[in-house]
Regions:
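Long, highly hydrophobic alpha-helical transmembrane signal-anchor segments
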Residues: 1-53, 125, 133
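Alpha-helical transmembrane segments and their immediate juxtamembrane interface regions
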Residues: 2-7, 117-155
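Loop-to-transmembrane-helix entry motif
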Residues: 8, 12, 90-101
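Alpha-helical transmembrane segments of multipass membrane proteins
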Residues: 18, 50-54, 101, 105, ...
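Alpha-helical transmembrane segments and their membrane-interface junctions
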Residues: 20-25, 44-45, 94-116
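Transmembrane helix-loop junctions in multipass membrane proteins, especially transporters and channels
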Residues: 26-30, 63-67, 114-118, 153-154
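Membrane-water interface of transmembrane alpha-helices
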Residues: 53-73
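Short membrane-interface loop/juxtamembrane segments of multi-pass integral membrane proteins
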Residues: 73-91
Length: 155
């Protein structure tokens, strides 16, 4: 169960930092000049690179300490038949929750500009809204996998 929680938390942090880097680079730090487009990176990009290195090293250390953890398979690593069944159950739950979340996010994304602009006069950046919505969908997928795996394991 430790490897599932480790992977879920690690992947969640990875996705959230990656989304923050995308927003930082393409929205807040882009400059359009006559010479072309110029991108600069900031502190979030540095934090992301440091986290990526630390997470990869942590995964490598875990694969050396826990023989049932495969670096290539990650959270799908299984020591026995019970863990394979848990992974299968969690994959089904994760798939269903991700698909439902995608439909909800698509609905929000399509109607967000029309719903908020006229009554509230709020100008939203659709790129940022899209990145945030799809990041949330991915996080829901990771969380639902971890919760379903732990639920199945403790049942």
């Amino acid at each position: 169960m430790k490897k599932i929680i480790f992977e879920a938390i690690g992947n969640l942090i990875f996705v959230l930092l990656f989304a923050a880097v995308i927003i930082e680079v393409f929205v807040t730090n882009v400059k359009y000049t006559t010479d072309g487009t110029q991108f600069t990176t900031g502190t979030i990009s540095s934090i992301f690179l440091i986290y990526l290195i630390v997470f990869l090293i942590s995964r490598l250390v875990l694969s050396k300490k826990d023989k049932s953890y495969s670096l290539k398979q990650g959270e799908f690593s299984a020591a026995d038949e019970r863990e394979k069944n848990n992974a299968y159950f969690a994959s089904i739950v994760s798939y269903k929750s991700t698909i439902i979340s995608l439909f909800i996010a698509l609905g929000i994304f399509v109607f967000i500009n029309n719903l908020l602009n006229p009554p509230f006069d709020i100008e939203l950046n659709l790129f940022v809204s899209g990145v945030v919505l799809f990041t949330l969908v991915i996080c829901i997928g990771f969380l639902s996998y971890a919760i379903a795996w732990v639920f199945q394991d403790t049942r």
